[in-house]
């Protein structure tokens, strides 16, 4: 339900709804121990109480205008990690092109793909498909916006990618920082958080692999995941960017994969390593490319 004003029980005594979440979940699990449970932390409301029960299967966060920035998504994932003892993944209920959906039209593909790219790269997932259509409002039967054939195809690639590389995307790991630069001027790079006019990197160490996500904000007209009016511009395709990154450990293999290219299939790349600097050429970046160093 999210945040409400002061609430009262039948006898007129104030009730802290959020503090009641835990006992509600505990009682439900006790009554139905064989059932899987999930509870919606609307705008983060009650997320700590929900997660600390240890009785839900994943976090479910319905996010709204008060959490409209891409940085808010990462903050939610961090908090949920703490609340769930780093054992639970997060699903965002996040309605795209919300204002545009007041009238009939078509989803804005660039906005959808950039948001999914960020959510997936950060380790989250996105509840955005309901029945036979994409969700644009909290009233799920709303079908004012339709998906183009391009978007339908892209959704298959993005969810195939999320599934194929789930161990790298959603199976823990330690966030770190990898210094990276482009030596032929094909892209401007910055480390998380995102900047307009730039390609943002987000890095994690996952087991014996160093993972670096490239997220393309080069053409972005805002840093809001919601793309409420459906105006996010299409990202320009970047090809053959000469990249260097500082890695002290010996590199045995370097590969990339993207839901925007080759159906998400990995491509092993040639590279050189000298004095802790790894040099290679990135085949392409549209919205999201994942670099994996072994």
Predicted regions and their residues:
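Aromatic/acidic polysaccharide-binding cleft in carbohydrate-active enzymes
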Residues: 4, 84-177, 206, 218
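Acidic-and-aromatic substrate-binding clefts and catalytic sites of carbohydrate-active enzymes
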Residues: 42-49, 63-76, 99-109, 136-137, ...
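Acidic (Asp/Glu)-rich catalytic clusters
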Residues: 50-53, 77-86, 119
């Amino acid at each position: 339900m999210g945040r409400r004003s002061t609430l009262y029980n039948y006898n007129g005594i104030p009730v802290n709804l959020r503090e009641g979440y835990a006992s509600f979940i505990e009682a439900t699990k006790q009554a139905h121990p064989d059932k899987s449970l999930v509870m919606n932390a609307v705008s983060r409301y009650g997320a700590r109480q929900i997660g600390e029960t240890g009785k839900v299967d994943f976090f479910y966060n319905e996010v709204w205008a008060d959490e409209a920035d891409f940085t808010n998504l990462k903050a939610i994932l961090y908090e949920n990690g703490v609340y769930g003892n780093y054992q639970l993944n997060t699903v965002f209920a996040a309605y795209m092109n919300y204002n545009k959906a007041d009238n009939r039209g078509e989803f804005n593909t660039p906005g959808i793909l950039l948001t999914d790219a960020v959510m997936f790269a950060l380790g989250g997932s996105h509840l955005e498909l309901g029945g036979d259509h994409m969700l644009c409002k909290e009233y799920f039967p709303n079908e004012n916006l339709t998906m183009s054939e391009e978007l339908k195809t892209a959704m298959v690639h993005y969810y195939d990618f999320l599934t194929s590389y789930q161990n790298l995307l959603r199976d823990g790991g330690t966030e770190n920082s990898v210094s990276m630069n482009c030596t032929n001027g094909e892209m401007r790079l910055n480390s998380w958080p995102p900047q307009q006019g730039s390609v943002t990197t987000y890095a994690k160490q996952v087991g014996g692999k160093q993972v670096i996500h490239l997220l393309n904000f080069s053409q972005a007209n805002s840093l809001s995941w919601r793309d409420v009016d459906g105006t996010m511009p299409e990202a320009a395709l970047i090809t053959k960017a000469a990249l260097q990154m500082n890695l002290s450990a010996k590199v045995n293999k370097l590969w990339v994969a993207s839901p925007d290219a080759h159906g998400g299939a990995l491509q092993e790349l040639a590279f050189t390593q000298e004095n802790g600097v790894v040099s290679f050429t990135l085949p392409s970046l549209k919205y999201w490319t994942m670099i994996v160093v072994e």
